[in-house]
């Protein structure tokens, strides 16, 4: 039976009139559809019965779709809505005119280096925006990259890959195609971070330059072995004419250890841009400029002015020595009662109403999709049906104008983000990074007494002696990897990281009955990359401690601390620790990084909210002014 005969073209699915089958794969089908209630044309993905009935997949898909729907970046094809009709799960997405990068490479072969860099730069912009919002893609590959005729690139299928287990993909026979781009840590029990997306992007860069993925094999086992232990291929050795500088770019992007990779997708894209010759850098800039100008909407005409005027974690006793981690029983609680802690950041109420056709439908983030070209293809959903129209075919559609204010705001947002992306890519010579902060400047970065008192809500906190070495106190933590989430500047935490110097201060009110305690430290590393890598590693360990209780043994005394959820992601992370049986005594840990300096702060008291985060931010500001 042909694709056309076996499709649901012409039928209704809830409020959607399915007009054209765009693609088919192991997870389901993609249709061009008209939303008959809201009168716009979209892409609708219908999941197979196997996936729709899988409770794990259903919950993951809903969660990831809600997160991915928040992304507002020109190179991201957003999810507008999700839900189910008669037990079948679906996703509604913007319809985009384009063909997937995999088809382009198979039909035309490798891209020129400038064109490859232009496309990687756009996808890096999408990934960095997602990572900043705490969203990982997990399935970056040519099939999930759409290219328009003017080389404007989109990254699709946010949330789908992460909703699907690798075992499920294996059962569907699609794992080998996906595993060509999987980072080594995805084949182990190690935590998978956003740097897995950077690894995959480096694999895509390799394929754009050479026409082939880095590793090719007939079995998933061979692919896994190559990613884990195989040498990283050199594009210049595979295809003559590729600048040798790309070998180093791909090697770092595909580093076996996540901490050895680029700190962001944008860093990888910038390195790829710098690997081009000067004429090719200009060519890549021209491609980016042309794609932006042809795809992003023009600014709205100015509105005439109105004719009428507008209507108007520390112990409660000082540690001995001063750098001893917190652990001593605090003094009695003050007479006031601490206020309730605020709810988790980003918590959103559920939808207030849902149409009868989709009882579990997800919230719509906006009143309708941003008007865009009308063809969607790819996303790992298989090739278009045989005999279908040209991928550049235009299909008339009904329009539903956006309100003027919302439209103008969207246009401004897209233009600003687009302009930033162009500027980064087309500058002829990159701005030189700042010189590393010298060790003798570390003490000047710490907050003085008045600054610490202002943040902590005190008036009498005073600093102790300067700290110039890591704390090596004989402290035992039941979960050793959580020691850094509990205490500042710990020798076991920093040992072997390559740091070069530390400077810190402990501040509190005089005497034994202090109500506030702060340990602030700044740690110098040889390079900014090493400092960022340390913070990323710390973030991974802290997240593994969230919700857990640890037992601390310090000088023959035992204490128990419970970790809340970690907030933020590198470059800044925070977590609150509560001491058991200490009448509300809490500490907030904060860690951040600027240039080659790691900022390490612990702020303790009875009314802890984000004091450590504020202190860290103020220190970062000082580092950036150096």
From Swiss-Prot:
Q: Which GO terms describe its cellular component?
A: peptidoglycan-based cell wall; plasma membrane
Q: List cofactor names only.
A: a divalent metal cation
Q: What kind of modification does the protein receive after translation? A: Autophosphorylated on threonine and serine residues. Dephosphorylated by PstP.
Keywords assigned by UniProt, alphabetized:
ATP-binding, Cell membrane, Disulfide bond, Kinase, Membrane, Nucleotide-binding, Phosphoprotein, Serine/threonine-protein kinase, Stress response, Transferase, Transmembrane, Transmembrane helix
Induction or repression: Repressed by low pH and heat shock. Up-regulated inside the host macrophages.
- For whether the record's keyword set contains Nucleotide-binding, the answer is yes
Phosphothreonine occurs at which residues?
170
Active-site residue list: 139 (proton acceptor)
Q: Where's it mainly located?
A: membrane
Q: What happens when the gene is disrupted?
A: Deletion causes hypervirulence during the chronic phase of infection in BALB/c mice. Mutant displays increased resistance to acidified nitrite stress. Does not affect sensitivity to ethambutol.
- Residues in domain Protein kinase? 16-276
UniProt binding sites for ATP = 22-30, 45
Per the UniProt entry, the disulfide pairs are 482-545, 587-604
Q: Which residues lie on this side of the membrane: Cytoplasmic?
A: 1-403
Membrane topology, record value? Single-pass membrane protein
PROSITE patterns given in the database record:
PROTEIN_KINASE_ATP, PROTEIN_KINASE_DOM, PROTEIN_KINASE_ST
Residue ranges of the region described as Disordered: 292-396
Q: Which Enzyme Commission number(s) are listed?
A: 2.7.11.1
Residue ranges with Low complexity bias: 343-355
* Similarity section: Belongs to the protein kinase superfamily. Ser/Thr protein kinase family.
**Name of the protein this chain belongs to:** Serine/threonine-protein kinase PknH
**What is the scientific name of the source organism?**
Mycobacterium tuberculosis (strain ATCC 25618 / H37Rv)
């Amino acid at each position: 039976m042909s694709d056309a005969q076996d499709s649901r073209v012409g039928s209704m699915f809830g409020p959607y009139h399915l007009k054209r089958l765009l693609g088919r794969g192991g997870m389901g089908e993609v249709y061009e559809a008209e939303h008959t209630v809201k009168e716009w044309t979209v892409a609708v993905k219908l999941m197979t019965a196997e996936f729709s009935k899988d409770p794990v997949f259903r919950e993951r898909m809903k969660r990831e779709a809600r997160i991915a729907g928040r992304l507002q970046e020109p190179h991201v094809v957003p999810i507008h809505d999700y839900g189910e009709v008669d037990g079948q799960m679906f996703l509604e997405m913007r319809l985009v005119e384009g063909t997937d990068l995999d088809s382009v490479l198979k039909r035309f072969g490798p891209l020129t280096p400038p064109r490859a860099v232009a496309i990687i730069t756009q996808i890096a912009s999408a990934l960095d925006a997602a990572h900043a919002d705490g969203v990982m893609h997990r399935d970056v590959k040519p099939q999930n990259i759409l290219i328009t005729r003017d080389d404007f690139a989109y990254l699709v299928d946010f949330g789908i890959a992460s909703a699907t287990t690798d075992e499920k993909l294996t059962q569907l026979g699609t794992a080998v195609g996906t595993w060509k781009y999987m980072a080594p840590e995805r084949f182990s029990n190690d935590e998978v971070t956003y740097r897995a997306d950077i690894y995959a992007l480096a694999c895509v860069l390799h394929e754009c330059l050479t026409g082939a993925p880095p590793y090719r094999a007939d079995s998933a086992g061979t692919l896994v072995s190559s990613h884990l232990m195989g040498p990283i291929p050199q594009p210049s050795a595979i295809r003559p004419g590729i600048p040798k500088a790309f070998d180093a770019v791909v090697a770092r992007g595909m580093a076996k250890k996540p901490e050895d990779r680029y700190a962001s997708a944008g860093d990888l894209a910038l390195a790829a841009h710098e690997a081009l010759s000067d004429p090719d850098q200009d060519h890549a800039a021209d491609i980016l400029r042309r794609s932006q100008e042809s795809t992003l909407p023009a600014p709205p005409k100015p509105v005439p002015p109105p004719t009428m005027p507008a209507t108007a974690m520390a112990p409660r006793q000082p540690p001995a020595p001063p750098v001893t981690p917190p652990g001593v029983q605090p003094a009695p609680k003050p007479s006031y009662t601490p206020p309730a802690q605020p709810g988790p950041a980003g918590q959103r109420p559920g939808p207030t109403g849902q149409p009868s056709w989709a009882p579990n439908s997800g919230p719509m983030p906006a009143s309708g999709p941003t008007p865009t070209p009308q063809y969607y293809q790819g996303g790992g959903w298989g090739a278009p049906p045989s005999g279908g129209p040209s991928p550049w075919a235009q299909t008339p559609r009904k329009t539903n104008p956006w309100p003027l204010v919302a439209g103008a705001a969207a246009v401004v947002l897209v233009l600003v983000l687009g302009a930033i992306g162009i500027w980064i890519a087309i500058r002829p010579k990159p701005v030189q990074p700042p010189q590393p902060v010298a060790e003798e400047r570390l003490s000047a970065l710490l907050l003085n007494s008045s600054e610490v008192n202002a943040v902590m809500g005190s008036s009498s906190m005073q600093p102790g002696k300067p700290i110039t070495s890591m704390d090596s106190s004989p402290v035992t933590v039941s979960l050793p990897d959580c020691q850094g989430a509990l205490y500042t500047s710990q020798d076991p935490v920093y040992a072997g990281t390559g740091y070069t110097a530390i400077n810190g201060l402990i501040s509190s009110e005089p005497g034994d009955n202090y109500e506030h305690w702060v340990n602030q430290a700044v740690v110098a590393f040889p390079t900014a990359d090493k400092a960022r890598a340390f913070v990323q590693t710390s973030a991974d360990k802290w997240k593994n401690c969230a919700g857990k209780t640890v037992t601390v043994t310090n000088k023959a005394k035992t204490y128990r601390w419970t970790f809340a959820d970690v907030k933020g992601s590198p470059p800044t992370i925070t977590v609150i620790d509560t001491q058991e049986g200490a009448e509300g005594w809490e500490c907030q840990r904060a860690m951040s990084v600027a240039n080659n300096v790691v900022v390490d702060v612990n702020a303790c008291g009875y009314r802890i909210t984000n004091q450590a985060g504020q202190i860290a931010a103020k220190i970062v500001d000082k580092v950036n002014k150096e």
